[in-house]
Structures are given as structure tokens and as C-alpha cells.
């Protein structure tokens, strides 16, 4: 198990969580994942991620090979490019993205989608309702599931529209009894 963050509190919480689940030697590092200091490539079999979105990063600090995939400062696109780079061939990723990744019209949005479908196998797109991450974020999100293959593929993509998750979609996120 490996993880990176620039928030030391999140690093401690992550390490404690892994230890509580009997993961004895996690590799949790203080590192800016999309910066030039992170040059990991083709290393991981599985990536599960809820990357930061709706943010930007200083262009000078972004690793050049991420800019080659999608020339942007938007975190939600840079992290997708990072996951594609870090996966081994045959490696799988499931990550949460804002709907803008799916529907954005900028060149950066188009280039990351093109990379996913032309050079990887898109397996699933799971649309989630806008309140599922409240009170932290109120945007509509989706889970993208893909496999790094080196060749494109969208012939068997599972699409699912999740209407609810068993909790109210307001800021209180109360459990719904009839579930």
C-alpha cells in the first residue's frame, strides 16, 4: 500500500487507518503527487483514488510527462494523467472524478478522455448524485474504472446511474430508514 499527500495530518490518519486494518508496512510519503519530485511510472497493479478536484497547481511544479497528456493546471485532470502513468500494463484504476471530467469541453478535458479511451480500456462509468460528498463537496461526481492496456477500448463499458447511497443528499447526510 502506497500513498502520497502534502498534508501531514492526512498522512498520519492514513497510516493509522492502514495499521488498524493490519497493513503493517504501508509506504505513506509527504510528496506532491503531480510535481516533478514524483517520477513513479508503471509500478502499480491497482489504484483506488479520490483525488482533489476543483483546484489548480502552479504550472512550473507540474511533472512534464503529465503536461504531455493534458496541458492544464486542473488537479482533477492531472491526477487522472498521474494514475495512467503509475499503472503497470494490465493495472486497474477506480477513481472519483467531478462530472466536468466527463463533459468538459476544453482541450485539456478532451485530451484526458482521448488518452483513456484510445490507449486504455474503459470498464465502467458510475454516475453519483451531487450530494453524496456533502458537506465537503456538493458537485456531481462519477467513478471511472479503467485498465491500462496500451490499446483503446470502449466495447464493453458498464454505465450505472446511482440515484442514492442510503443517506440524505443534504448537508446532514442522515441515514434513510427505508433502505
Task: Describe the residue ranges of each PLM region.
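Conserved SAM-binding motif I beta-strand of class I
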Residues: 1-5
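A conserved structural/catalytic subdomain of Rossmann-like adenosyl-cofactor enzymes
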Residues: 41-179
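S-adenosyl-L-methionine
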Residues: 6-42
